[in-house]
Swiss-Prot record:
GO cellular component: cytoplasm; microtubule
Segments of this protein annotated with the region Disordered: 421-447
Compositionally biased region (Acidic residues): 432-447
The organism of origin for this protein: Rhynchosporium secalis (Barley scald fungus)
Effect of E198G: Resistance to benzimidazole
Keywords in alphabetical order: Cytoplasm, Cytoskeleton, GTP-binding, Magnesium, Metal-binding, Microtubule, Nucleotide-binding
InterPro entries assigned: Beta-tubulin_BS, Beta_tubulin, Tub_FtsZ_C, Tubulin, Tubulin/FtsZ-like_C, Tubulin/FtsZ_2-layer-sand-dom, Tubulin/FtsZ_GTPase_sf, Tubulin_C
Keyword Heme: no
Keyword Ribosomal protein: no
Source taxon at top rank: Eukaryota
Ligand binding (Mg(2+)): E69
TM helices/strands, residue ranges: none
Protein's name in the database: Tubulin beta chain
Amino acid sequence: MREIVHLQTGQCGNQIGAAFWQTISGEHGLDGSGVYNGTSDLQLERLNVYFNEASGNKYVPRAVLVDLEPGTMDAVRAGPFGQLFRPDNFVFGQSGAGNNWAKGHYTEGAELVDQVLDVVRREAEGCDCLQGFQITHSLGGGTGAGMGTLLISKIREEFPDRMMATFSVVPSPKVSDTVVEPYNATLSIHQLVENSDETFCIDNEALYDICMRTLKLTNPSYGDLNHLVSAVMSGVTTCLRFPGQLNSDLRKLAVNMVPFPRLHFFMVGFAPLTSRGAHSFRAVTVPELTQQMFDPKNMMAASDFRNGRYLTCSAIFRGKVSMKEVEDQMRNVQNKNSSYFVEWIPTNVQTALCSIPPRGLKMSSTFVGNSTSIQELFKRIGDQFTRMFRRKAFLHWYTGEGMDEMEFTEAESNMNDLVSEYQQYQDASISEGEEEYEEEAPMEPEE
């Protein structure tokens, strides 16, 4: 029944992945060792999208855990849900990629990749009707970015007709982890543009802001950030895991969200987000959810949609919600903010409903938007990239692993093309007549 195989690569990917599995195990009534002790049949009905049933009433995630060093894996294994995963599905090297994309993509990662693909193949064979893959990784490091994109392209070769969704943590403007982030991210985006079907962009700084401003946490830990990400991942995948009135799967989401194949980078948001103390002062209603969901402060990527326009967006409501109320609210948002939606896609807001809310909430909503303002994010990375690349700073780390400067130039120009494509569709209007759309080349971005 429409299974999804999940991969997590690198430190960031494994930590987000672990939080995700913790969240959905809870939603489906599984304990830390995968034994079902839930209360509702709805939890079991489509459990097999993400879990494989093993002997003895135990459910095992269809997850492949990959890293080039054993550290993070050991932490996952020792964590509260460490006994959930199948031991053979931990694939790790010993050397680490040292934040070097080339090591992850060409040298260290390439040595490990066949081992990973064996595990992926085995998981895929255990599926009835595989729907696709999802991968969690960061774009700033070596393993998640370099090896993650290598895996995506290899899986693409082997399963060309399956969906590929990525949850990618992009480097944030202020919070930087390593100095070569712009290189790693640009090289990764170059790959994702070609090989992924939908990429959900998440950004640490935006997550920090949500934790500080909305959740009122004084010093948020990575655990808090990962919790937010897992809430969104759980929301995006909720239609796949529970029966609902208006269900969608990865492919339906892509059909509704991706007007042009290269423009598949989404902003995500989640509501309700309230600080612990303020819970009792707010009623969670559909208007409230809709308003918070479209609030720029709620977006988990550091780009403000008010600087661009939505090509498409999708909202997934969970809980006991009336269909009519949701549709009215969504129409309301569109009418009030019509200038933020492109007018040449008439019905660009899609809604899905699922009757089962997340744990501890009456109702919630998850937002996925394809906005042209995501180009800010690519522009920012591109600028940092160019500044370093002009001076050829740190390049020897990459050329030493056998990379060519040409590859950097290609990645840079591909990203610039992406930015100008977004810009072109942001500026396009109905009235310009048909001749605009016949030319294939993206217009030059106006400086």
